[in-house]
A protein has these predicted regions:
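Conserved alpha/beta-domain cores
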Residues: 1-190, 195-197, 203-205, 219-220
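Gly/Pro- and small hydrophobic-enriched strand-loop and loop-to-helix capping segments
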Residues: 207-221
Length: 221
């Protein structure tokens, strides 16, 4: 097997073990391969060994890499996992299949208008700033329930779940447990949490989506 195939198999094995340890089915967990800062040739290597779901942080970088890859692999699914500026909403709606970065009223309103205009409705995760960090995107936990209701009832967004990025200097498990609890409280079945350093913990605590980069691609360029 190629190095990409080996890395992918190892991550999937660890996801499966973590899922089974929690009494879950491995197929209940979606692996999002985070390809930010890596060129299209690295993405293609993973596509060739069966990976189909990828995550990108920046709209412009994704625009440079993924149209050609999507043409070659029509079943490729692309997730936006980085902060989204309102002036990039149209481009994001056109390219991404899932938006994991919905985090404020103004953005929700712009996305709703764009979805209506284009007739394309990417599934939405609401990003929660569980650590309440000033420098980080995400709705604050105290404001989440009202924002979920607004996204559903006012903006009519296809909200399917929640996403978080825990503070690097805090125990990730506490944030994963909080996100899972908030998702359940709002009737949301999907939770995107866990990265290369902690995705097994996230799976044990109920993650339906894990965002893994360095364990698949190596260090960022």
């Amino acid at each position: 097997m190629s190095e990409s195939a080996d890395d992918l198999a190892e991550v999937k094995r660890r996801i499966a073990e973590a899922a089974k340890a929690a009494g879950r089915q491995p197929d209940d967990v979606t692996l999002v391969a985070v390809s930010k800062t890596h060129g299209p040739e690295r993405v293609r290597e993973l596509l060739e060994v069966g990976q189909r779901i990828f995550g990108e942080n920046r709209v412009q970088e994704a625009q440079e890499k993924f149209p050609a890859l999507k043409a070659d692999y029509p079943d490729l699914e692309l997730h936006l996992i980085g902060p989204l500026q309102t002036n990039k909403a149209r481009d994001a709606d056109a390219l991404f299949d899932v938006n994991q970065s919905v985090d404020r009223e103004r953005l929700a309103g712009v996305l709703a208008k764009e979805m209506e205009r284009a007739g394309k409705r990417p599934a939405c995760f609401i990003q929660v700033n569980t650590g309440e960090e000033e420098q980080k995107a995400g709705i604050l936990p105290a404001d989440l329930d009202a924002f979920v209701a607004s996204c559903r009832d006012v903006h009519k967004l296809p909200v399917v779940g929640l996403m978080c990025i825990p503070p690097v200097d805090e125990e990730a498990a506490l944030h994963f447990a909080l996100l899972h609890k908030m998702a359940a409280r709002n009737g949301l079945a999907k939770v995107s949490m866990g990265m290369s350093a902690d995705y097994e913990t996230a799976v044990r605590l109920g993650a339906t989506h894990v965002r893994v980069g360095s364990a698949l691609f190596g260090a960022r360029h």
